[in-house]
């Protein structure tokens, strides 16, 4: 999880298509899932506002949501990368600090 402030922007990590944008999955709150290719998905969880819709094409660095606490008790971004359906360490895909 990545801590932050409510309303802080969340950006797409890579180009892709939004395959899910909603809040029907228990415990995830407002969730966005982007399919980048046949192997990779990224998930952005607990968003305050979602700025994209399902089937929308997004570009790397595009603002897709704002940070929030939907489905949890504190403001945070739960960020996942999945490779062939399996969760992998997302730090490999984030910019160096």
UniProtKB/Swiss-Prot annotation:
What CDD domains has UniProt attached to this entry?
M23_peptidase (cd12797)
Q: Please give, as recorded in its UniProt entry, the membrane topology of this protein.
A: Lipid-anchor
Q: Does the keyword Membrane apply?
A: yes
List keywords of the entry alphabetically: Cell inner membrane, Cell membrane, Lipoprotein, Membrane
> Cell inner membrane: is it a keyword of this entry?
yes
Q: Where in the cell is it found?
A: Cell inner membrane
Question: Which GO CC terms are listed, alphabetically?
Answer: cell division site; cell outer membrane; plasma membrane
Extent of the signal sequence: none
Q: Which GO terms describe its molecular function?
A: metalloendopeptidase activity
Cross-referenced Pfam families: Peptidase_M23 (PF01551)
The family note in this entry says:
Belongs to the E.coli NlpD/Haemophilus LppB family.
- Name the UniProt record assigns to this protein: Lipoprotein NlpD
The organism of origin for this protein: Yersinia enterocolitica
Q: Which gene encodes it?
A: nlpD
């Amino acid at each position: 999880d990545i801590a932050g402030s409510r309303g802080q922007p969340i950006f797409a990590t890579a180009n892709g298509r939004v395959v899910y944008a909603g809040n029907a999955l228990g415990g995830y709150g407002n969730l966005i899932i982007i399919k980048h290719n046949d192997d990779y998905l990224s998930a952005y969880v607990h968003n305050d506002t979602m700025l994209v819709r399902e089937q929308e094409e997004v570009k790397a660095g595009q603002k897709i949501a704002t940070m929030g606490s939907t489905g949890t008790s504190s403001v945070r971004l739960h960020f996942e990368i999945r490779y062939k359906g399996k969760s992998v360490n997302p730090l490999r895909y984030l910019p160096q600090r």
